[in-house]
């Protein structure tokens, strides 16, 4: 949810024609429209800010996924991120995602969930950059190590809370770096499957893919064999002691 400068024209009423086909995307339904407007009102939403890096139907939004669109909204003077369920989503409500988001919040992870309805989740809006853009703008080794450790600490908290995010191998879409990193989007999370948050994030940051390549350019090589051995030890027993061994192997 990257912040850009906002002009007055970006802010519209919740009944604006510019927002009409976002509140029920991709298929508009007159019968459902008033229901979703009522949901927005129940959350205290007074206006929508059409801003973001993603374009949907010619309109800027904060994000777009398989389950929902993310738009920026206001309740009085407070700014929120709204995740609005797509009409073609693979689920009928946002209730389970909201439940999992609350569990993550209880572990100290994720933007604060402020409220939810059948079709909408309202949460704290995080002003920041995705981790790839952030790495492109930052080269200070201590800061990169600090952010990497903070991400893994949050992953450890999720592991301890028995909630698996499910998509942390794709960190660019699920971590926003502001004054600190935030893990976002719990639509694929589960409290049933085995947790592998630390494992997935470690591999994404240090071992495989574009993020790992950028981190390597800035921090230098890691001892891959030592890291892999530490990961195996942690996967076998997700104890703090083993997590500390992993952090040590990563020099963070």
Enumerate the language-model features and the residues they cover.
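Conserved structural core of kinase catalytic domains
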Residues: 102, 109-149
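C-lobe/activation-segment region of protein kinase-like
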Residues: 163-167, 178-252
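Active-site beta-strand termini and strand-to-loop segments that position acidic
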Residues: 72-76, 125, 177-179
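A conserved alpha-helical element in kinase catalytic cores
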Residues: 83-117, 146, 205, 209
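Hydrophobic residue at the +6 position relative to the catalytic HRD Asp in the kinase catalytic loop
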Residues: 171-177
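Protein kinase catalytic-loop region centered on the HRD/HxD motif
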Residues: 153-166
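Juxta-kinase regulatory segment immediately upstream of eukaryotic protein kinase catalytic domains
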Residues: 1-59, 246-251
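ATP-binding glycine-rich loop module of kinase domains
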Residues: 33-34, 42-96, 102
